[in-house]
Regions:
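A structural motif
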Residues: 1-4
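AMP-binding/adenylate-forming catalytic core of the ANL superfamily
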Residues: 6, 11-12, 21, 35-127, ...
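Short Gly/Pro-enriched turn/cap motifs at secondary-structure boundaries
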Residues: 23-28
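Acidic/polar alpha-helix N-cap and adjacent early helical turns
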Residues: 154-161
Length: 161
Protein backbone atom coordinates (compact mmCIF):
# COMPACT_ATOMS: atom_id res chain seq x y z
CA UNK A 1 0.00 0.00 0.00
CA UNK A 2 1.33 3.39 -0.99
CA UNK A 3 2.19 5.78 1.86
CA UNK A 4 3.59 9.26 1.23
CA UNK A 5 5.06 12.10 3.27
CA UNK A 6 6.48 15.47 2.32
CA UNK A 7 5.97 19.21 2.05
CA UNK A 8 3.38 18.81 -0.72
CA UNK A 9 1.21 16.35 1.21
CA UNK A 10 -1.73 17.80 3.12
CA UNK A 11 -1.43 17.72 6.90
CA UNK A 12 -4.90 16.40 7.70
CA UNK A 13 -8.57 17.24 7.96
CA UNK A 14 -9.57 20.31 9.96
CA UNK A 15 -10.93 19.38 13.41
CA UNK A 16 -11.26 15.67 12.59
CA UNK A 17 -8.73 13.81 14.74
CA UNK A 18 -10.53 10.49 14.33
CA UNK A 19 -10.25 10.52 10.54
CA UNK A 20 -6.69 11.83 10.67
CA UNK A 21 -5.67 8.88 12.88
CA UNK A 22 -7.13 6.53 10.27
CA UNK A 23 -5.31 8.08 7.30
CA UNK A 24 -1.88 8.79 8.80
CA UNK A 25 0.44 6.16 10.24
CA UNK A 26 2.50 6.58 13.41
CA UNK A 27 5.41 8.06 11.43
CA UNK A 28 3.26 10.72 9.78
CA UNK A 29 2.89 9.04 6.38
CA UNK A 30 -0.40 9.56 4.53
CA UNK A 31 -2.02 6.20 3.74
CA UNK A 32 -3.34 6.66 0.20
CA UNK A 33 -5.36 3.46 -0.17
CA UNK A 34 -3.53 2.77 -3.46
CA UNK A 35 -1.80 -0.52 -4.19
CA UNK A 36 1.37 -0.42 -6.24
CA UNK A 37 4.19 -2.53 -7.55
CA UNK A 38 7.78 -1.69 -8.33
CA UNK A 39 8.20 -2.16 -12.08
CA UNK A 40 11.85 -1.16 -12.40
CA UNK A 41 14.60 -0.41 -9.96
CA UNK A 42 18.24 0.60 -10.23
CA UNK A 43 20.82 2.27 -7.97
CA UNK A 44 19.32 5.74 -8.44
CA UNK A 45 15.64 5.36 -9.23
CA UNK A 46 12.56 3.25 -8.68
CA UNK A 47 9.57 3.20 -10.99
CA UNK A 48 6.15 2.31 -9.65
CA UNK A 49 2.80 1.42 -11.14
CA UNK A 50 -0.47 1.85 -9.26
CA UNK A 51 -2.37 -1.41 -9.62
CA UNK A 52 -5.59 -0.71 -7.76
CA UNK A 53 -7.22 0.38 -4.53
CA UNK A 54 -7.17 -1.48 -1.21
CA UNK A 55 -10.95 -1.15 -0.89
CA UNK A 56 -11.46 -2.91 -4.24
CA UNK A 57 -9.55 -6.08 -3.32
CA UNK A 58 -11.66 -9.25 -3.38
CA UNK A 59 -10.88 -11.62 -0.50
CA UNK A 60 -11.74 -15.23 -1.39
CA UNK A 61 -11.07 -17.66 1.47
CA UNK A 62 -8.37 -15.33 2.77
CA UNK A 63 -6.66 -15.04 -0.63
CA UNK A 64 -6.51 -11.56 -2.14
CA UNK A 65 -7.58 -10.94 -5.73
CA UNK A 66 -6.80 -7.67 -7.49
CA UNK A 67 -9.67 -6.81 -9.85
CA UNK A 68 -7.37 -4.49 -11.80
CA UNK A 69 -4.99 -7.36 -12.65
CA UNK A 70 -7.79 -9.42 -14.19
CA UNK A 71 -9.49 -6.42 -15.83
CA UNK A 72 -6.24 -5.44 -17.55
CA UNK A 73 -5.94 -8.91 -19.07
CA UNK A 74 -9.60 -9.31 -20.02
CA UNK A 75 -9.64 -5.89 -21.66
CA UNK A 76 -7.22 -7.34 -24.24
CA UNK A 77 -9.65 -10.11 -25.24
CA UNK A 78 -10.97 -9.35 -28.75
CA UNK A 79 -14.59 -10.01 -27.72
CA UNK A 80 -14.49 -7.69 -24.68
CA UNK A 81 -15.52 -4.06 -25.06
CA UNK A 82 -15.53 -3.21 -21.32
CA UNK A 83 -14.95 -5.17 -18.13
CA UNK A 84 -15.18 -4.71 -14.38
CA UNK A 85 -14.63 -7.28 -11.65
CA UNK A 86 -16.50 -6.95 -8.40
CA UNK A 87 -16.84 -9.06 -5.27
CA UNK A 88 -19.91 -11.22 -4.86
CA UNK A 89 -20.93 -12.58 -1.43
CA UNK A 90 -20.39 -16.31 -0.99
CA UNK A 91 -21.31 -18.46 2.00
CA UNK A 92 -18.25 -20.70 1.68
CA UNK A 93 -15.46 -18.37 0.53
CA UNK A 94 -16.67 -15.05 1.95
CA UNK A 95 -16.38 -13.38 -1.45
CA UNK A 96 -15.92 -14.59 -4.99
CA UNK A 97 -15.19 -12.56 -8.08
CA UNK A 98 -17.80 -11.72 -10.66
CA UNK A 99 -16.76 -10.54 -14.11
CA UNK A 100 -19.11 -7.92 -15.51
CA UNK A 101 -18.47 -7.71 -19.23
CA UNK A 102 -19.83 -5.61 -22.06
CA UNK A 103 -19.07 -7.78 -25.10
CA UNK A 104 -18.19 -6.43 -28.51
CA UNK A 105 -21.37 -6.32 -30.58
CA UNK A 106 -22.21 -9.74 -31.98
CA UNK A 107 -19.86 -11.57 -29.61
CA UNK A 108 -20.98 -14.11 -27.03
CA UNK A 109 -18.80 -14.78 -24.01
CA UNK A 110 -19.12 -17.59 -21.50
CA UNK A 111 -17.46 -18.01 -18.13
CA UNK A 112 -15.46 -20.89 -19.62
CA UNK A 113 -14.10 -18.67 -22.43
CA UNK A 114 -13.23 -15.90 -19.96
CA UNK A 115 -11.42 -18.26 -17.60
CA UNK A 116 -9.59 -20.08 -20.40
CA UNK A 117 -8.27 -16.69 -21.54
CA UNK A 118 -7.12 -15.84 -18.02
CA UNK A 119 -5.44 -19.26 -17.69
CA UNK A 120 -3.55 -18.57 -20.93
CA UNK A 121 -2.16 -15.50 -19.14
CA UNK A 122 -1.00 -17.63 -16.18
CA UNK A 123 -3.63 -16.45 -13.70
CA UNK A 124 -3.90 -18.67 -10.61
CA UNK A 125 -7.08 -20.71 -10.40
CA UNK A 126 -8.25 -19.13 -7.12
CA UNK A 127 -8.36 -15.74 -8.90
CA UNK A 128 -10.64 -16.88 -11.72
CA UNK A 129 -14.13 -15.36 -11.74
CA UNK A 130 -16.86 -17.72 -10.59
CA UNK A 131 -19.69 -15.67 -12.02
CA UNK A 132 -20.14 -13.81 -15.29
CA UNK A 133 -22.72 -11.14 -16.01
CA UNK A 134 -22.91 -9.69 -19.52
CA UNK A 135 -24.33 -6.20 -19.81
CA UNK A 136 -25.15 -3.70 -22.55
CA UNK A 137 -23.10 -1.10 -20.69
CA UNK A 138 -21.38 -0.58 -17.35
CA UNK A 139 -23.06 1.97 -15.05
CA UNK A 140 -21.11 5.24 -15.01
CA UNK A 141 -21.66 8.73 -13.68
CA UNK A 142 -21.71 11.91 -15.79
CA UNK A 143 -17.90 12.08 -15.98
CA UNK A 144 -17.49 8.40 -16.85
CA UNK A 145 -16.49 6.99 -13.46
CA UNK A 146 -17.63 3.42 -12.89
CA UNK A 147 -20.42 3.25 -10.31
CA UNK A 148 -19.32 0.13 -8.44
CA UNK A 149 -22.08 0.23 -5.81
CA UNK A 150 -24.69 0.41 -8.58
CA UNK A 151 -22.92 -2.38 -10.46
CA UNK A 152 -23.09 -4.60 -7.36
CA UNK A 153 -26.87 -4.06 -7.26
CA UNK A 154 -27.18 -4.86 -10.97
CA UNK A 155 -25.18 -8.06 -10.46
CA UNK A 156 -27.22 -9.08 -7.42
CA UNK A 157 -30.43 -8.68 -9.45
CA UNK A 158 -29.01 -10.51 -12.49
CA UNK A 159 -27.66 -13.46 -10.49
CA UNK A 160 -30.79 -13.82 -8.37
CA UNK A 161 -33.17 -13.50 -11.35
Amino acid sequence: ELKIRGAGVFSGYWNNDELNEAIFDEEGYFITGDLFEIIEENDEDRYYRVVGRVKDIIVRSGMKISPQELEDILQTHPAVKEVALIPYPDGIHGEISCACIVPVEGQNLTLEVVNDYLREHKIASFKLPEKLVTLDQLPRNAVGKLLKAHLREVVKNEVNA
